[in-house]
Amino acid sequence: MKYVSEFRDPELGQRLIAKIEQQLQALSRSAERPLKIMEVCGGHTHAIFKFGIEGMLPDSIELVHGPGCPVCVLPVGRVDDAVANAGGPRVIFATFGDAMRVQGAKHSLLQAKASGADVRTVYSPVDALALARENPDRKVVFFGLGFETTVPAVALTVLQAEAESVDNFFVFSNHITIVPTIKAILDAPDHELDGIMGPGHETMMNGVE
């Protein structure tokens, strides 16, 4: 398998859909409602919409979009803290672009930037570390976001900053663990989920249990 081309093969996709329909017919379950499967990973949600997978599935399957975006489930108070950090003296606040428009109780980071805060969009914590190197007289605060899968890159960047004696680099860590999040959903008595489409990279971080 060449990894990319096979996953974008429409004929292969149709054959997989046909197999799913066969499996559904073999399931011994009530027909009162569709089989509800929740995808957890935001990458899965993006792929489902991009390739129209939801529309290809039979009516007996309903995809439930789960908490796949850590930015979307970020508490309002954390956004307020980020805005407060960004407004600090001599601070460069570095964040992923998708966090810019998330609204706090009063302001978003984008609004803070418009009001004069030095908020900059980066693609990785390494970019934020580069800002710290380039601005030794400023405090560079990286808005650490994501599930367990993003933590190693942030941790490695912190170690790199220590190795280089870059003492003006800081991390405002707001990482979320996925297992308690999913457990809270499954513990709800009215969730009606029949299955979960788990992200492989999270499984690598958390283990099979």
Regions inferred by a protein language model and the residue ranges of each:
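Metallocofactor- and cofactor-centric catalytic cores in central/energy metabolism, strongly enriched
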Residues: 1-137, 151, 155, 159, ...
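Internal active-site segments that recognize and position negatively charged phosphoryl groups
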Residues: 141-143
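Glycine- and acidic-residue-rich phosphate-binding/metal-coordinating active-site segment common to enzymes
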Residues: 168
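Ligand/cofactor pocket segment of small-molecule handling proteins
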Residues: 172-178, 199-201
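A conserved active-site cap/scaffold subdomain adjacent to cofactor or substrate pockets
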Residues: 192-209
